[in-house]
Amino acid sequence: MKIVVNEQIQRTVTVAPQDRLDAFSAPALRQQLDELAADGVLHYIIDLSATPFMDSAGMAVLVSLLRRTRQSGGSVKLVWPRAEAVRRTLQLTQFDRIFEFVE
């Protein structure tokens, strides 16, 4: 899975999964996020704009990140995906109620 991580600024990082976020690729994203947390990152922007598909494994990684980050006093923001199917899935599962979304 291709994951783009932009420069950290004041313990904030933007992570942009570029491929499907599913049971096969979710462990790679989880590992990347774990490494960033170990490096002291507190605030995450997860850019889903280029994510064409997401299943429950991908959503579980995001929920886990949100829990861990809130416990550490950090935050998680999600960039709305362009793929209508992913956007609809996030709305149906009410992710838009627990995460802050930006365009």
Stretch-by-stretch model annotation:
Residues 1-16:
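Short beta-strand/loop segment at the start of cytosolic alpha/beta domains
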Residues 20-98:
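Amphipathic alpha-helical interaction surfaces in cytosolic regulatory modules
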Residues 100-103:
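Short acidic-hydrophobic, aromatic-tinged amphipathic segments that line or gate anion-handling sites
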